Amino acid sequence: MKKPAIFFLFASLTVLLSFTAYSQTQDSTIKYKDGTYSGQSRAKYIYEPYWGSVHLTIKNGYVSDIRFVIRDSNLHETFDANYEKHFEGNAEYIQQSRNDWKGVQSYPIIYSDKQDINKVDAVSGATWSYNIFKASVNEALKNAK
């Protein structure tokens, strides 16, 4: 009696894994129109003075170049490695600023490699910049389909 149950379990698992692999393949095969596109977003942080901006180039249906920045509309400056100066004396915010700066630098590289925003994972401690990046990319790609 155990053999049919084990066989059924393995058969079910095989079907499930096949379906999962198929759906993941479908997500990564989306092709976009060649051109240059921009997207701007504040993601879910609508009460903060920050917004993200993505400029991407699509060549042969795939993203070939991508630039990402976060701007502070109150201070009129770009979020960068020096932004932590605004949090002098607050070690937690300084570390958060550093983590998010790592995200700003790495998300475009990871996205260019994966070609699927859903396959880009947030850098540890950099969810804020990840959410802004993801929303900005999605906004840019709306016009590229």
Regions inferred by a protein language model and the residue ranges of each:
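Bacterial N-terminal signal peptides that target proteins for export
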Residues: M1-L9
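Sec-dependent signal peptide cleavage junction
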Residues: F19-T29
